[in-house]
């Protein structure tokens, strides 16, 4: 084998090693954790969940006595070091925005408490968290009361800035599937200080969310 060929082979092997190392680091960045009412796929480098998944059901919303909202934001006990993020949020002006909403666990104390784990939080501008994001949460619960079961996925992408160990995402998304009607809805919100402009103005085709998030959405038959 000629010296020149050996050099090309060595270079090729080095490039492959770099590629595999990069892919390995990328794969290890996220971890999926299952809790009682939701599962979260958390990015350790970004400090926010890239995907959270759960069901909203009529049975889970209707009970004689609703549980008391916990309001204690704490690290996820299954990922304590990476989700010890309270100091990152303090004094920064961002809401600790729920992905899986506490109100979706109105009848389950454990699920309500688990909704306040930082593995379920995203740094959202108050205008989004208390505006269109909240409106969509309420609309989803209304749909569950009417149609019994709704499957929900949501997450965030990108980075505007860093606050401590937490990235403030550029956009937050949500996908909703109504089991009874087999209807899909997808929404994409810019994470900024603009006032709410209505859900219709943020509705997008499902494939847009699949492209930006890297996830495929389907229902297990």
Q: Which residues does each predicted region cover?
A:
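Hydrophobic h-region of N-terminal signal peptides that target proteins for export
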Residues: 15-24
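Boundary at the C-terminal end of the N-terminal hydrophobic targeting segment
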Residues: 25-30
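Domain-level detector of nuclease and nuclease-like folds
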Residues: 77-221
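Short, His- and charge-rich active-site/binding loops that engage polyanionic ligands
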Residues: 33-95
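Short amphipathic alpha-helical "recognition" segments used for binding
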Residues: 8-10, 40, 178
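N-terminal Sec-pathway targeting helices
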Residues: 1-13
């Amino acid at each position: 084998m000629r010296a020149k060929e050996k050099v090309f082979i060595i270079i090729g092997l080095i490039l492959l090693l770099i590629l595999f190392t990069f892919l390995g680091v990328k794969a290890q960045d996220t971890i999926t954790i299952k809790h009682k009412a939701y599962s979260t796929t958390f990015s350790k480098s970004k400090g926010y969940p890239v995907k959270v998944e759960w069901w909203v059901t009529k049975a889970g919303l209707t009970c004689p006595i609703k549980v008391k909202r916990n309001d204690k934001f704490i690290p996820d006990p299954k990922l304590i070091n990476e989700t010890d993020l309270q100091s990152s949020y303090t004094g920064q002006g961002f809401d600790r925005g729920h992905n899986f909403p506490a109100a979706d666990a109105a009848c389950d104390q454990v699920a309500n408490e688990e909704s306040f784990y930082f593995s379920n939080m995203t740094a959202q501008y108050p205008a989004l968290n208390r505006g269109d994001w909240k409106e969509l949460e309420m609309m989803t619960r209304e749909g569950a009361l009417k149609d019994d079961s709704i499957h929900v996925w949501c997450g965030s992408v990108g980075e505007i800035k860093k606050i401590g160990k937490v990235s403030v995402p550029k956009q937050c998304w949500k996908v909703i599937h109504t089991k009874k009607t087999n209807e899909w809805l997808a929404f994409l919100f810019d994470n900024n200080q603009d006032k709410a402009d209505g859900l219709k103005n943020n509705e997008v085709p499902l494939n847009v969310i699949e492209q930006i998030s890297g996830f495929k959405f389907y229902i297990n038959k």
